[in-house]
A protein has these predicted regions:
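Redox-cofactor binding/interface segments in oxidoreductases and associated redox assembly factors
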Residues: 13, 25-26, 65, 151
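Phosphate-coordination loops involved in phosphoryl transfer and adenosine-cofactor binding
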Residues: 15, 59-61, 116, 183
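A structural signal for the hydrophobic beta-strands that form the central parallel beta-sheet
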Residues: 25, 49, 113-115, 145, ...
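Glycine-rich Rossmann-fold phosphate-binding loop(s) that bind the pyrophosphate
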Residues: 67-69
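N-terminal Rossmann-fold NAD(P) dinucleotide-binding loop
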Residues: 72-73
């Protein structure tokens, strides 16, 4: 819990109350889940959310990437270097990602794009064995045998604790490039902040900018 209207600010934790003249909000974001059957049970057993982190564990195997934006397309391209087959599954009939990325992924022989399709269920007991698919246009159901499912459908900011305390936009904290929010003395850094690009390098930059702003504020 946070009490930002007072001075000093109060950060209430399970270990006690922390008093501070300034607070930096940097709680990050987590991958958005599909919310389908067996997704959470098989996480780490074939279900993954980071191709660059886990892709090498699927060398020579067949995998599916779910999504249609830049991240999904880049994940499919990355995995094509390790996997024998990559199925790129998108619920629409065209990608949202950059045209240059689309052309590259379409040219790779071991990537197959499956359009207008959603994943309804991930099948397997101890590990991923297959996925159940539904074509949204034809209502045709099918099952695809894969050993891995990489989910790339966006991220969700961890900002519930800040709701109502600072101005927000679709769950993200509205903050300037120097990290300043709508509340004096409160700053935001990393994936919680409104910005066009969310990567490790931009999060690190945000942290440096926010701390510099705190120093100036104090």
């Amino acid at each position: 819990e946070l009490k930002l209207e007072e001075n000093p600010k109060q950060v209430i934790t399970t270990g006690g109350v922390i008093l501070a003249k300034s607070v930096v909000m940097a709680s990050g974001a987590h991958p958005r889940e599909l919310g389908i059957e067996n997704e959470s049970q098989l996480r780490g057993r074939g279900v993954a959310y980071c191709a660059t982190c886990d892709g090498m564990f699927f060398r020579g195997k067949e995998v599916a990437v779910v999504g249609g934006g830049n991240t999904a397309i880049q994940d499919a391209e990355f995995l094509s270097d390790y996997c024998s087959k990559v199925y790129l599954i998108h619920r629409r009939d065209e990608f949202r990602g950059a045209k240059s990325l689309q052309e590259k992924v379409k040219s790779l022989p071991n990537i197959e794009v499956i359009w207008d399709t959603v994943v309804e269920k991930i099948n397997g007991t101890d590990k991923v064995e297959s996925i159940s698919l539904l074509n949204k246009k034809t209502n045709e159901q099918s099952e695809l045998e894969v050993q891995g499912v990489f989910i790339a459908v966006g991220i969700t900011p961890v900002t519930d604790v800040f709701s109502g305390l600072v101005e927000m936009d679709h769950g993200y904290i509205k903050a300037s490039e120097d990290g300043r929010t709508s509340v004096d003395g409160i700053f935001a850094a990393g994936d919680v902040r409104t910005k066009p690009l969310r990567q490790i390098v931009t999060a690190v930059s945000d942290g440096a900018n926010a701390i510099t702003s705190v120093e100036r504020y104090l």
